[in-house]
Curated annotation (Swiss-Prot):
Pfam assignment, any one: Enolase_N
A GO molecular-function annotation: phosphopyruvate hydratase activity
Subunit composition and interactions: Homodimer.
GO biological process, one term: glycolytic process
SMART domains (UniProt xref): Enolase_C, Enolase_N
Record carries keyword Metal-binding: yes
Pathway as given in its UniProt record: Carbohydrate degradation; glycolysis; pyruvate from D-glyceraldehyde 3-phosphate: step 4/5
Name used for this protein in its record: Enolase B
NCBIfam families hit by this protein: eno
Provenance organism: Dictyostelium discoideum (Social amoeba)
PANTHER family attached to this UniProt entry: ENOLASE
């Protein structure tokens, strides 16, 4: 089955910002994908093309990216077989001709790449996750541990919390469906605790469905999570993940971290400025007091030294995950492997721009013995591509926000459906699969 045409249109994401929906048309029908977008983005990510026309959507329109899909990518890929993913992705990279996909826009390229994969899975008569597993050469089909972002801070919320995400990680659940139930129950317990301590208006939610009460310190947020976990009776099965998104409060010129960066004028207050060593000490204290599963982006996106130090200190106990540090970029991943900078990769398909490169990044992580956490973006749609991606790659962990807001739940609900399909296959022909559980960081 060959590509007949490709069309893109402008739609809105979960933050009300423009993004692309891409349609790949073939003789067998139309296959589409919707493109996510981040708020806290790394400077080393593939380039997301925006129009810059302040008279439309404050400059965030994507009409130029749409033109690139319709007028450049479509005629170039016309006639190519949809089941030749690498050739299609390579052709788009060649057509773009830049190191960071800034000519066509990563948002244009990734939408096509995702839609092509859906078309190929259809002609092969297999679910998307099975097709991705074939592309990746992965036979270890398993359901991931979900990481629910239930307290929002950083750039995702209007409070003064410096760290961006505080997550529930139900590693002790027996299956994905139960992990989702555990997360939902703790989420509702947390809502009641926040309402009791901070008032009803403190239960408003942030970009990813998590609560954003007026907290000022990470320890306040962690104590709330522990109380909610204990109240729900899951103290032995749920751990906590933290995404500091430290690049947002790191000054690379001074190498200082402003823990009160959202308080206007705080940059002049010495008490809020931390050195890398001071921030490291805080992480170590947090690890002593709370049931931590991982730290994501604990330091700035080019602070290789302190990432390496924290990995050397506690990398044998928990995951140290690189997001802004690595940007799903194979070259940066190779450097981090060589220098032992982190021990896990955050995998975002739109950070690098094609499915082929995403699979390559995951393979590098696997070969290095790293963990690999598949991730959504803060600006999401109802597209659940990453649910099939995480199962197909078998990475064992996914984060898609809180168990709230449909653009988040679409991924979790898709994973429940996949689990049901795999259970049915297991009963009928013995096909094996598993829930990652406590082995979530090994794949």
């Amino acid at each position: 089955m060959s590509i007949e045409s490709i069309k893109a249109r402008e739609i809105l994401d979960s933050r009300g910002n423009p993004t692309l929906e891409v349609e790949v048309w073939t003789s067998e029908g139309m296959f589409s994908a919707k493109v996510p977008s981040g708020a806290s983005t790394g400077i080393h990510e593939a380039f997301e093309l925006r129009d810059g026309d302040k008279s439309r959507y404050f400059g965030y329109g994507v009409l130029n990216a749409i033109v690139n899909v319709n007028n450049l990518i479509s005629p170039t890929l016309k006639g190519m077989r949809v089941d030749n993913q690498k050739a299609i992705d390579d052709k788009m990279i060649e057509l773009d001709g830049t190191k960071n996909k800034s000519k066509l826009g990563s948002n244009a390229i990734v939408g096509v790449s995702m839609a092509v994969a859906r078309a190929a899975a259809s002609i092969k008569g297999v679910p998307l996750y099975r097709y991705i597993s074939q592309l990746a050469g992965n036979s270890n089909i398993r359901l991931p541990v979900p990481c629910f972002n239930v307290i929002n801070g950083g750039k995702h919320a209007g409070n003064r919390l410096p760290f961006q995400e505080f997550m529930l990680v139900p590693i002790g659940a027996p299956k994905f469906k139960e992990a989702l139930r555990y997360g939902s129950e703790v989420y509702h317990s947390l809502k009641e605790i926040i309402k009791e301590r901070y008032g009803l208006d403190a239960t408003n939610v942030g970009d990813e469905g998590g609560f954003a009460p007026n907290l000022t310190s990470p320890e306040e947020a962690l104590t709330l999570l522990v109380d909610a976990i204990n109240h729900s009776g899951y103290q032995d099965v749920i751990k906590i993940g933290i995404d500091s998104a430290a690049s947002e409060f790191w000054n690379p010129k001074t190498s200082k971290y402003d823990m009160d960066f959202k308080n206007i004028g705080s940059s002049h207050l010495k008490s809020s400025l931390n050195s890398g060593e001071q921030l490291m000490s805080r992480y170590l204290e947090i690890l002593k007091k709370y049931p931590i599963a991982f730290f994501e982006d604990p330091f700035g996106e080019d602070d290789w030294e302190n990432h390496g130090k924290i990995t050397a200190a506690i990398g044998n106990k928990i995951q140290i995950i690189g997001d802004d540090l690595l940007c799903t970029n194979p070259e940066r991943i190779k450097k981090a492997i060589s220098e032992k900078t982190v021990n896990s990769l955050l995998l975002k398909i739109n950070q690098i721009g094609t499915l082929t490169e995403t699979i390559e990044a995951a393979k590098l992580a696997k070969e290095a013995g790293w963990g690999c956490l598949v991730s959504h973006r803060s600006g999401e749609t109802d597209d659940h591509f990453i649910a099939d991606l995480v199962v197909g790659l078998g990475t064992g962990e996914i984060k898609s926000g809180a168990p709230c807001r449909f653009e988040r739940l679409s991924k979790y609900n898709r994973l429940m459906k996949i689990e049901e399909e795999l259970e049915k296959l297991h009963r009928s022909n013995g096909n094996s699969f598993e829930y990652a559980g406590e082995e979530f960081y090994h794949f």
